[in-house]
Regions:
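Compositionally biased alpha-helical segments
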Residues: 20-71
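Sec/Tat signal peptide C-region and signal peptidase I cleavage site
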Residues: 15-19
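A composition-driven surface/loop motif
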Residues: 70-409
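Sec-dependent N-terminal signal peptides
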Residues: 4-13
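Basic side chains
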Residues: 2-3, 319
């Protein structure tokens, strides 16, 4: 009874206060309400408290605090990671839409189907045994602000809702994600949906089970200030379904045992730009040494309109760029296109897993299955190794402009 009276007194005070914040503590989750928009405070037989559509069991409430701090930003869930002491703060206007669980430094949230506006999930802090999981039915924003997260058992960050995910790297921030070895996860940072990456921050990725980063739909790097560093991966650096597009920023990939950037087709052949890579600007640097590895690999077309691409690739059967469809290298107005490749290796011989027959993959600077059009830009290439070649084209070659330098010729 004393507890209930305390709750009633606190809520009454909050309702009367202007420019104050009411915080409801349940475990390591804080629900933040601005007093001026709180509205009615309802008790249900003293066993439940309802605030802005969110119902709390009074037995689950640890405390209610009213202070003059600023309320959480609207439509926001904040996660402050701290080894063994991670806290979640959620704004009251979306609390009723989110099912949140905190277990140690592992945080999961599932948004209900009633969610009809975008929610921002803001992550920061450090945890050496933590993770973030999100599922839902509506597009969302994921913001990293000096986040350092390692999950020894699975993905560090897994977004599972299948919608557009706006990934923002806070300006000036450095963020690092690492997963554990021997898990079942597809990537250290996985998005089931399509990702648009922005912000003048840095994201470091280490994939100890499979890929460093993966998405089941397109990934688009949109901002010139964005820097993504793949430090290592058991398989691909970036593994993207549908298409990968880069308009600016910096992408550095090294230490992978698979391809640096791999764009694969989805199951629906009607999906926009399926299996394509589109580079309109920015800088990509790739340094990888492995058997039959590729720097850039597009299952279908690859289009380069601008930007700088530098690839140092070595290993039998390796390729600086592998194009399953057509390749266009152009230089858009106001842009500069520069491709520098150093590729070394001999022929990789193997048994085809489908036919069971012997097969081989030759070392190439650029391998094009379809047609190749060069209309602008500069390509510099050094290729070494027995039977290695600079550019191999199965289809037609059309020259409209630009420069190609291959050593040896």
């Amino acid at each position: 009874m004393k507890r209930i009276f305390t709750l009633i007194a606190a809520t009454a005070l909050t309702s009367a206060a202007v420019a104050q914040t009411m915080k409801v503590y349940t475990g390591h989750v804080v629900t933040s309400y601005a007093a001026e928009v709180l509205g009615d405070v309802n008790f249900n037989n003293g066993t439940q408290l309802t605030l802005q559509g969110k119902t709390f069991n009074t037995s689950d409430i640890d405390s209610i605090v009213v202070d003059r701090s600023q309320a959480a930003a609207a439509r926001t869930m904040q996660v402050a990671y701290a080894n063994g002491n991670t806290w979640v703060t959620v704004s009251g206007d979306v609390a009723s839409l989110l099912n949140i669980a905190v277990k140690g430094d592992h945080v999961s949230v599932v948004a209900t189907p009633e969610t009809a506006e975008e929610i921002t999930y803001a992550l920061g802090g450090t945890a050496t045994n933590g993770s973030f999981y999100m599922d839902g039915h509506y597009k969302s924003t994921l913001r990293f602000d000096n986040l350092n997260l390692t999950n020894p058992d699975s993905a560090a960050v897994c977004i599972d809702n299948g919608k557009r995910i706006n990934v923002i790297l806070a300006d000036g921030s450095t963020n690092s994600l690492t997963d554990g070895a021997g898990g079942m996860q597809k990537a250290c940072f996985f998005i089931n949906g399509h990702a648009e990456i922005k912000g003048a921050g840095v994201l470091n990725l280490t994939g100890n089970t499979k890929h460093a980063y993966a998405s089941d739909e397109y990934t688009w790097i949109k901002n010139g200030g964005t820097t993504i560093n793949v430090l290592s991966a058991v398989s691909d650096g970036l593994h993207v379904d549908q298409y990968f597009q880069m308009d600016g920023g910096t992408l550095n990939v090294s230490g992978t045992k698979g391809d640096c950037v791999d764009a694969s087709c989805t199951k629906d052949p009607a999906d926009l730009q399926n299996g394509q890579i589109i580079i309109n600007g920015g800088a990509i640097t790739m340094d990888v040494a492995a058997i039959d590895v590729k720097g850039l690999k597009g299952e279908k077309d690859v289009t380069i309109n601008g930007g700088t691409i530098k690839a140092t690739v070595s290993g039998d059967g390796s390729k600086g760029m592998s194009v399953g469809g057509n390749l266009l290298v152009a230089q858009a107005e106001g842009a500069t296109t520069l491709i520098n490749m150093t590729v070394s290796g001999t022929t990789y011989k193997y048994t085809d897993p489908i036919t069971g027959l012997p097969d081989s993959s030759k070392c190439r600077g650029i391998k094009v299955t379809g047609n190749y059009t060069l209309s602008g830009g500069t390509i510099n290439m050094t290729v070494t190794g027995k039977k290695a070649k600079g550019i191999s084209i199965d289809g037609e070659y059309k020259y409209l402009g630009g420069t190609t330098n291959v050593v040896p010729e």
